[in-house]
Amino acid sequence: MRDGEGLAILKYEGQKADRGLDPDGVEVPIDPRRDETLSIYTEYGLTDRLTLQTKAALTRGHDNFVDYEGRGPIELGLRYALLHTDRSAVSLYLGTTKDGVGRNAGYAAPGQGDTDLEARLLAGTSRQWRGAQGFAELQVARLKRSGLADETRIDVTAGLRPTPRWLLMVQAYTGQADSQPVQSRWRKREISVTRDLGAWSLQAGWRRTLSGRETPVDHGPVVAVWRRF
């Protein structure tokens, strides 16, 4: 993000599950659960290299044992551009999160968790492919979590613009918690399409858990409104 430029994303995520993955990664029935989140994410360029990131959310959900509704996680951090060329970028993000009343980890009970510290390395590149603009990004993160097991996360995104106003994206979210006696793992896939309308963009997609262990097989829509300024 360049000096003085910004981005805001208002996003709704609705996830539900009645199946889960056991310690051996086998899919089994679980008590039905539903989790919904409405979040606002922002980026603002403090300088050409330093970007402020924030995120706040409201959340609600229920299963057979508990209902919850209230504040979701609050995130604050800084991203520094280590390398930036016309086609590629490498950045380092350092941030902190105050966990909310909902599921702060897919394997945990609602409300479990306190404060997280995160270090994340991001690397991305863009290319032309058959007349269309494409890009790919890899993110690797380590989270030190209070009240929850520490986590390692790897996120991969691939995007293609078949026309200047349309963006197709495939994203993979992979993670593992240092939980005991079984380390929870998950791999989720999100496919979405985004339509640009000047400074605004509209995004709609679907997210689903593909594999893992000690984690729910959740799935549901993701809808977002983007605003660049």
Language-model-derived ranges and their functions:
Residues 142-144, 152-157:
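Short helix-loop boundary/capping segments
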Residues 1-145, 161-226:
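Transmembrane beta-barrel domains of Gram-negative outer membranes and organellar outer membranes
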